[in-house]
């Protein structure tokens, strides 16, 4: 293990939230990240502001990332899930202060329509978006988040059927 890898393992996780947003057909909102050349699709996620509860952060992040907060929380994950970003990304993300994120996940029912979604926000994270089926979700997600997504799907799957 290199010194830089060991140093990265000593970094904390950034506290955040993730949102599995369902439409009326139980398809899941995914966005293609704007900051990479590869096809990196993900569900919306973001940080928790100090003093903010995870559920408040989830609804704020939903509005910030998809331009709408039309929806309600169905469920909150029972635990915090974490993932590490590849070491080459650490200096580029969060000023190099975190090795990845620990997240509380929320299953959210979107009550708006497609026209309510606007990814061209003041700080856009996505350049494309679509609704994905539960079956295809894991195959389109960026690989370093796949294990976390598998755990989230397993926890929420019975509520999606």
Curated annotation (Swiss-Prot):
Q: Which GO terms describe its cellular component?
A: cytoplasm
Q: Which cofactors does the annotated protein need, by name?
A: a divalent metal cation
Among the record's GO biological process terms, what is one? mRNA catabolic process
**Nudix hydrolase domain: residues covered:** 12-154
Q: Which GO terms describe its molecular function?
A: mRNA 5'-diphosphatase activity
Q: Where is this motif: Nudix box?
A: 46-67
* Enzyme Commission number(s) of this protein: 3.6.1.-
Coiled-coil stretches: none
Quick check: keyword Hydrolase in the entry?
yes
Q: Name one Pfam family in it.
A: NUDIX
**Keywords carried by this UniProt record:** Hydrolase
EC top class named in words: hydrolase
Q: Which domain of life is it from?
A: Bacteria
Q: Which family does this protein fall into?
A: Belongs to the Nudix hydrolase family. RppH subfamily.
Q: What does this protein do?
A: Accelerates the degradation of transcripts by removing pyrophosphate from the 5'-end of triphosphorylated RNA, leading to a more labile monophosphorylated state that can stimulate subsequent ribonuclease cleavage.
Protein name according to UniProt: RNA pyrophosphohydrolase
> What organism is the protein native to?
Rickettsia rickettsii (strain Sheila Smith)
Quote the gene name from the UniProt entry.
rppH
């Amino acid at each position: 293990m290199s010194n830089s890898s060991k140093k990265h393992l000593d970094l904390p996780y950034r506290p955040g939230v993730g949102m599995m947003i369902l439409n009326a057909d139980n398809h899941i909102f995914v966005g293609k990240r704007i900051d990479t050349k590869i096809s990196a699709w993900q569900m919306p996620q973001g940080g928790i502001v100090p003093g903010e509860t995870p559920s408040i952060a989830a609804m704020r992040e939903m509005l910030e990332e998809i331009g709408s907060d039309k929806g309600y929380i169905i469920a909150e994950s029972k635990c915090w899930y974490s993932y590490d970003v590849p070491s080459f990304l650490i200096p580029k993300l969060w000023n190099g202060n975190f090795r990845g994120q620990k997240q509380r996940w929320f299953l959210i029912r979107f009550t708006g329509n497609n026209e309510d979604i606007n990814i061209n926000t003041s700080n856009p994270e996505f350049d494309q978006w679509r609704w994905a089926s539960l079956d295809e979700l894991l195959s389109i997600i960026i690989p370093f988040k796949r294990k976390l997504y598998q755990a989230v799907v397993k926890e929420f799957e019975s509520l999606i059927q």
